[in-house]
Amino acid sequence: MTAPSLVVHSEPQCLTLRDAIATPFELVAPADAPEQAPRHASFKAYTRGCLYDSDGARVDLSVRVGGVGGDQAASLDPAILPPEQRGGSWLTGRALYLGPCMNHYGHFITEGLSRYWKQDIGPVDHVVGYPFMHNNGNIQIEAFHRHLASLLDVPIDRMAILRSQTVFDEIVVPEQLWATNVHVNAHMRTVYERIRARHAGRKSSGRLFLSRAASKRLGNPLAVEEAFASFGFRVIHPERVPIAEQLALYANCEVLASLSGSGMHNCLFARPGLMTIEVGDTRARRNPVLTQRMAHELAQVEAHFIPFGEGTEADIEPKIVRKNLRKILSELPRRGPVLMLRLKRRFGGLGGGKAQKRG
């Protein structure tokens, strides 16, 4: 039986509002919202803060609803803003609304970028957005935010954070095209293609395996790295590689593999039809999580998954990884690249570097 599609094909919406009201951002602990139905164990916070039109009606296009599946946050914004709560500091001119700003890389390249699709907005005087639950509601703009936003002509460094009630002379509100654990709009392919096109066409970056030095959900990433190295994969720790170099690697690779999580989301920047290989962990034991399945379908990649298994330990069996790779790649492992990897670790060389030659 074919699973329902996670990609929708509706025409994206974009509203232009006059005299709209932005309520201030607020984090609400689950214990402080007892009227809400119980959530799953990893749920962290409710949020308040969205736009209302001049009549006090909530602008649903401005809301990150959340709370679906394993999502860790959900909105508490009421449908109507009472008359006595309307008003606020007036912001003259034209503003662009970006919704919640995601500090976390994986959230930013999925739902965060999904309000950056509108290309014909015209000049704006202000860029505004909300914080999110990460880092206790504080915004941390990093190099990857700046680079990706600049490729899409969005001046993120000008973004003002909505922490006090504000009334807008005029505000443009693009729809959020990625609804976490619900669906993603096919128009997002255009966003990722615009990014990929700026980095594609260079020399092949070969087979890539994206890893990390430590993981709460996988106890033996070094052993997994060696399994992939034995099949000719370059082991890369993305946090050590500048974002522009990362995007060039993803746009020009032959196979993209990763531990489960944000690294695997980078398939969105790769070419359609690319083979991807994900290694499961204690969260994604049998299948990719829903966000990753959305990314796979949107990116139109040939996705493979190595199950973690049902054991109580946090380690995955390296022999299981190698067995799966033999089956997926139809080839045998080699010892030489593993020895090279160990030397690179010793001398701190797990950044971008040069592609390995296949022998």
Predicted regions and their residues:
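The feature primarily captures lumenal catalytic ectodomains
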Residues: 1-359
